[in-house]
UniProtKB/Swiss-Prot annotation:
<dbReference type="Pfam" id="PF02634">
    <property type="entry name" value="FdhD-NarQ"/>
</dbReference>
<feature type="binding site">
    <location>
        <begin position="258"/>
        <end position="263"/>
    </location>
    <ligand>
        <name>Mo-bis(molybdopterin guanine dinucleotide)</name>
    </ligand>
</feature>
<feature type="active site" description="Cysteine persulfide intermediate">
    <location>
        <position position="121"/>
    </location>
</feature>
<comment type="similarity">
    <text>Belongs to the FdhD family.</text>
</comment>
<dbReference type="GO" id="GO:0016783">
    <property type="term" value="F:sulfurtransferase activity"/>
</dbReference>
<dbReference type="GO" id="GO:0006777">
    <property type="term" value="P:Mo-molybdopterin cofactor biosynthetic process"/>
</dbReference>
<protein>
    <recommendedName>
        <fullName>Sulfur carrier protein FdhD</fullName>
    </recommendedName>
</protein>
<keyword id="KW-0501">Molybdenum cofactor biosynthesis</keyword>
<keyword id="KW-0963">Cytoplasm</keyword>
<dbReference type="GO" id="GO:0097163">
    <property type="term" value="F:sulfur carrier activity"/>
</dbReference>
<dbReference type="InterPro" id="IPR016193">
    <property type="entry name" value="Cytidine_deaminase-like"/>
</dbReference>
<dbReference type="InterPro" id="IPR003786">
    <property type="entry name" value="FdhD"/>
</dbReference>
<dbReference type="GO" id="GO:0005737">
    <property type="term" value="C:cytoplasm"/>
</dbReference>
<comment type="function">
    <text>Required for formate dehydrogenase (FDH) activity. Acts as a sulfur carrier protein that transfers sulfur from IscS to the molybdenum cofactor prior to its insertion into FDH.</text>
</comment>
Amino acid sequence: MSQIKPSRLSSSAEIRGARQLDVLQRHKLAEPQQDWLAEEVPVALVYNGISHVVMMATPKDLAAFALGFSLSEGIISSPQEIYSIEMTPGCNGIEVNIELSSRRFAGLKERRRAMAGRTGCGVCGIEQLDDIFRPITPLPFTQAFNLEHLDTALAQLKQVQPVGQLTGCTHAAAWINPEGELLGGCEDVGRHVALDKLLGIRAKQPWQQGAVLVSSRASYEMVQKTAMCGAEILFAVSAATTLAVEVAERCNLTLVGFSKPGRATVYTHPQRIK
């Protein structure tokens, strides 16, 4: 399998996922200059030769994205059920070719859906309403987080957003331990894709205790993906939707919104928050 490593902050010249373009800057006077823009390309996830989904994504950490998406969508239950991940760049985008175990591929064919996603869109193309909600085993109550350590995590979040720092155009998803230390994270123009990348990285790391921190709002699917991968706590910098709260309540996930220095709104299962 392609090696998966957490994103690290690097110099501007080395940053993948961003390009410089000529722009006209208007502030009283018009001034031509160069500016950094985040890259957004179509990424097709192809399982055993069959295209399953096309998402718009930032072209970095794509092996982690493929693994995390496969886990959070219930296509696989462990990384060992993927034998290889290979990238094939093309004129119109990038194909990520994933070799599944025969048992998992047979299951995928049974419930296969064709999706053509917008940026980070996770339900485009689903044919039936019943397909939106996946069965999730209720999470255990084995973890806790002291809100005093949330400020530490928030202060480190930009470390996993080198493209975001240049462009102001990416979401971040990070794994934080109970002391608020950021262990790793990813960024993408799509918040769901950033989360899938993180979940893919976490699957290859010995990170058990801790929580997910995202720079975006918390939609129902962010909750669903987090719970599918066994994480018990999700911190979102912005608000949560009503459906996100309902799903979090049902699957025993602690959902926290408006995660800011010195404050937070706990929507569900507050017993994990100290």
